[in-house]
UniProtKB/Swiss-Prot annotation:
Cofactor: [2Fe-2S] cluster; Mg(2+)
Keyword Iron-sulfur: yes
Binding site residues for [2Fe-2S] cluster: C119, C191
Protein's pathway: Amino-acid biosynthesis; L-isoleucine biosynthesis; L-isoleucine from 2-oxobutanoate: step 3/4; Amino-acid biosynthesis; L-valine biosynthesis; L-valine from pyruvate: step 3/4
Gene that produces this protein: ilvD
Disulfide bonds: none
Protein's recorded name: Dihydroxy-acid dehydratase
Residues annotated with N6-carboxylysine modification: K121
Family to which the UniProt record says this protein belongs: Belongs to the IlvD/Edd family.
Length: 550
């Protein structure tokens, strides 16, 4: 066992003494050491309940002959960080979390890990760190939040972001907005739709890294405690059997996750996180081109918020990810999972699917997959749109650019009534390096939706979008403005042509004009000169490469 390097032999007497100071016995030190990686915090609703889950995991570890050691990582709530400088730290926190997991596990000689994340960057961050070690691990995601209810209608966090736009144009009163605020988020869990946190939980299960149904069991459901306990027991088996993550995370496993993502219409942020996770196995193991290629294999089969009518509770009751695998059985690759059964064995074990929620492939919500990769002179390395949450009339759009050099400039213009039907809002200098941190543009997109412009106005950015964004929102434009991408040279009034069906995005300019404008661009000057974001800005790769640190 790896932990023998910490605890075995006369030379390790000082090490054992320190462990005994923590309350561990000689008997405990004979067992496999299991790190229980928690991300409990009192400021993030997706994480406020994780102490209960970590206790359940530890019970499972003890019951099956292991010794658990709990430690914590940071966890940022994108919703609380949204719309201000704090959002610049969200994506970069993924790398801190990965480094923390790697450092703690290696320093203390853990034989296996159970990861307990919930929200957006914590899920991929923990997995990335654990993959660097290539020791057995299982993920217990914290689970979705239940939707709230206002005046007989379900609501959740995005109802409020869009409510701000509705208030600005007089659709609702401030009192009504306040009333929605009181009931939209009723308790623990990740936001109630198929936003980034829940998308990543679903893909983690599809990768084979969580036990079946884990992704969709809700935070307040006792089933979540039971599956946490079962996971604690299972990790001891994986350590004894030496089942490494690289035995599970083959190219085909990643393809399964991407197929599930495309079929469900998950968050565009998955196109950052899946390549970043795969990068820990091999550079460019998975790229945007894989999303593009696989998007032709499956249709969009689930109508889940923000692009549809259902919530995560509906997906769970419809059969969860195993039911999605069953529906996609003809496309799914047969891969290993931490459960011990193969992906197809899990799919074949499903006895019930609600086909009103998870549609059959031959009767989909949309014929096209839920995510689309676009390329053209504006984004030669690619950009991403959640086409499953776009009004079909906006699948093709041509309009004049309204250009803003930050999210703050753009939101002021949108709320100030400066955007009209037909416009293409361009927000630049918000990329991984230029932002820095690639802020999510949920406030601008929600304002556009709330004001009723989402069927006539497109938004393009080198930043990214919340999983809760809907409408014609095209993000991750690569190269970004800070890297000299064409988005840096667009001017007000330039005509931008978008064709989501043909996967194209271009600005209507002669090549000679493009070259002249690019030649006049000033050299990028980092906005932040000290601290973590200064280092991040210098070291981060492009969005099309997963925004990983070089």
């Amino acid at each position: 066992m790896i932990s023998d390097n910490v605890k075995k032999g006369v030379i390790r007497s000082p090490n054992r003494a320190l462990l005994k100071a923590c309350g561990y016995s000689d008997e405990d030190m004979e067992k496999p050491f299991i790190g229980v990686v928690n991300s409990f915090t009192e400021v993030v609703p997706g994480h406020i309940h994780l102490k209960t889950l970590s206790d359940a995991v530890k019970h499972g570890v003890y019951a099956n002959g292991g010794t658990p050691f709990e430690f914590n990582t940071i966890g940022i709530c994108d919703g609380i960080a949204m719309g201000h400088e704090g959002m610049k730290y969200s994506l970069p926190s993924r790398e801190i979390i990965a480094d923390a997991v790697e450092s703690m596990a290696r320093a203390h000689g853990f034989d296996g890990l159970v990861l307990i994340p919930t929200c957006d960057k914590i899920v991929p961050g923990m997995i990335m760190g654990a993959l660097r070690l290539n020791i057995p691990f299982i993920v217990v995601t914290g689970g979705p939040m239940l939707p709230g209810e206002f005046q007989g209608k379900k609501c959740e966090l995005i109802s409020l972001f869009e409510g701000v736009g509705e208030y600005q144009v007089g659709k609702i009163t401030e009192e009504e907005l306040k009333s929605i605020e009181e009931c939209a988020c009723p308790g623990a869990g990740s936001c109630a739709g198929l936003y980034t946190a829940n998308s990543m939980a679903c893909l983690t299960e599809a990768l084979g890294l969580s036990l079946p149904m884990c992704a969709t069991i809700h935070a307040v459901d006792a089933q979540k405690v039971r599956i946490a306990k079962k996971t604690g027991s299972k990790i001891v088996d994986l350590v004894k059997e030496d089942v490494k993550p690289t035995d599970i995370l083959t190219k085909e496993a990643f393809e399964n996750a991407i197929l599930v993502d495309l079929a469900l219409g998950g968050s565009t942020n998955t196109t950052l996180h899946i390549p970043a996770i795969a990068n820990e196995i091999e550079n460019k193991f998975i790229t945007l081109d894989d999303f593009d290629r696989l998007s032709d294999e499956v249709p969009h089969i689930a109508s889940i918020k923000p692009g549809g009518e259902h919530y995560m509770i509906d997906l769970h009751n419809a059969g969860g990810i195993p039911a999605v695998l069953k529906v996609l059985k003809e496309k799914i690759r047969n891969t290993k999972t931490v459960d011990g059964r193969s992906t197809l064995e899990i799919a074949e074990s499903v006895k019930y699917v609600n086909y009103d929620v998870i549609r059959k492939v031959e009767a989909p919500v949309h014929e096209t997959a839920g995510l689309r990769v676009l390329k053209g002179n504006l984004a030669p390395n690619g950009c991403v749109v959640k086409i499953g949450a776009v009004d079909p009339k906006m699948h093709k759009h041509e309009g004049p650019a309204k250009v803003y050099n930050s999210e703050d400039e753009a939101i002021a213009a949108i709320l100030g009534g400066k955007i009209v039907e037909g416009d293409v809002v361009v927000i630049r200098h918000e990329g991984p390096s230029g932002g820095p941190g690639m802020r999510e543009m949920l406030s601008p997109t929600s304002a556009i939706c709330g004001m009723g412009l989402d069927d006539s106005v497109a938004l393009i950015t080198d930043g990214r979008f919340s999983g809760g964004s809907r409408g014609p929102c095209i993000g991750h434009v690569s190269p970004e403005a800070a890297a000299g991408g064409l988005i840096a040279a667009i001017e007000n009034g330039d005509i931008i042509k978008i064709d989501m069906i043909e996967k194209e995005i271009n600005v209507d300019l002669d090549e000679s004009v493009i070259k002249e404008r690019l030649s006049k661009l000033e050299e990028f000057e980092p906005k932040i000169k000290k601290g973590y974001l200064s280092r991040y800005s210098r070291l981060v790769s492009s969005a099309d490469e997963g925004a990983v640190l070089k």
